């Protein structure tokens, strides 16, 4: 059971406490590095900080969201690894490109797989991107496969262009494959027409 601040008790089999991630920027502040509008360390496309001799990567840095075209926080291991490679290449003088992030992620919890990429409706609207969404339920494999499983899938797109902005999926089967396809479509600037 859960006991609320009001004293009210709520019966529950499982409780998930999700408190978010706050970047640890104390050392950066002490070093005089610029902190961005998100509260994370402001960096260039090659992860150089406001001190040209210091690079920063990972949960403590701002990333460029390719869809909102604004700085964002993205505390995920995959992007942090790519950031480290980009910074290492820059240190060694190897040119590279950083097109930003879409925020693709996947997790398995309580026997379900969930994955997402791009923007959800709330984030799109908060960034004044006119959008709508479509919800569908399909199977993770061809329906005649004996181990196929339903997937709940939501696709977010820009109105009126139809540009794909993001997707979320959940199910017991392989949802990440569907999200990978949408992430590729987003990277290509794809629209609903491209999904036909």
Kindly give the residue locations of the regions a language model identified.
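FAD-site-proximal beta/loop scaffold in flavoenzymes
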Residues: 2-3, 8-89, 181, 185
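Flexible, glycine-rich terminal cap/loop adjacent to redox cofactors
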Residues: 19, 110-117, 126-196
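A short alpha-helix-loop-beta-strand transition element characteristic
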Residues: 34-38, 94-105, 130-134
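Glycine-rich flavin
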Residues: 63-64, 95-99, 193
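Active-site-proximal substrate-binding core of FAD-dependent oxidoreductases
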Residues: 71-75, 90-117
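Short, hydrophobic alpha-helical segments
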Residues: 88-95, 186, 190
């Amino acid at each position: 059971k859960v006991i609320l601040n009001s004293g009210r008790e709520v019966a529950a089999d499982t409780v998930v406490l999700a408190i978010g991630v706050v970047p640890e920027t104390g050392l950066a502040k002490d070093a005089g590095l610029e902190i961005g509008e998100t509260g994370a360390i402001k960096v260039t496309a090659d992860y150089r900080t406001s001190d040209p001799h210091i690079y920063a990567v990972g949960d403590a840095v701002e990333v460029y969201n390719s869809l909102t075209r604004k700085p964002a926080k993205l505390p995920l291991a995959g992007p942090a690894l790519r950031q480290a490679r980009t910074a290492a290449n820059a240190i060694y003088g190897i040119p590279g490109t950083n097109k930003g992030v879409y925020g693709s992620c996947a997790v398995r919890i309580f026997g379900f797989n969930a994955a997402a990429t791009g923007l959800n409706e709330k984030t799109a609207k908060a960034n004044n991107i006119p959008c709508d969404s479509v919800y569908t339920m399909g199977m993770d494999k061809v329906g005649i496969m004996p181990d196929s499983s339903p997937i709940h899938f939501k696709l977010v797109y820009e109105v009126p262009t139809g540009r794909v902005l993001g997707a979320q999926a959940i199910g017991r089967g392989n949802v990440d494959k569907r999200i990978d396809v949408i992430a590729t479509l987003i990277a290509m600037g794809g629209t609903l027409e491209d999904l036909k």
